[in-house]
Amino acid sequence: MSDDIDDPRRDFLVKMLTAGAFATGVWSLPATVQSMGKIPKLLPPGKSFFDISGEVMVNNKLATLDTFVKNNDVVSTGSGAHAVFVVGKDAFILRGNSSMEIEGNEIISTIRVFSGKLLSVFGHREDKKPLHMRSSTATIGIRGTGVYIESDPEKTYLCTCYGITDLSSNVDKNVQERIVSEHHDKPKYLLAKPSQKGKLITPAPMINHTDMELTLIEELVGREPPFGLEGGLYKGPRRDY
């Protein structure tokens, strides 16, 4: 990825930051991004965290910006905290009161979201095998995409921000659905108990995450999302830099 400020995408990010867009809420951003105040760029080797606020733990030890996150680690956050970090080709924003485990050998194979809220962008798997996300009520197959998930015992919220996901209910493995999304097209709830219409997978609104956040964490792994940040228009597959 080039650091050239003439890159229109990075130039736009710089303008938003220097104009105080984060602080003024122009983009209606959560505190996760408002508090950063720095331009994202490809993280160097050996670096995991881009931003930490509040109590962030890795394997039950208090994390700092120098903490390295690797496969088979557990990352958790306290009330009002957040963590923005990278593992390999994948990047995450873990919001407050959340806990996740990263499973895998050389690359991530499974993300377990025990509780809370997680925004993720995933690179394409070199072994061509799908990565899985697991929550209390859902199993999600993922290939090179961006997703936002909220997990609690009663339901899982999932927005396939772009790309393809395969949803499966943990309550009934026969309940499955493939989502093909260009730009937050088909958010879903995966329920612990059937809805009034007897459904375990139901439509949902887009909530609690933004295109600016997706752009920021894609930057950390040297990619750009498949939409125009200024207008949100779909413009094709993601590009690596």
Named regions from a protein language model:
Residues 1-11:
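Secretory targeting signals
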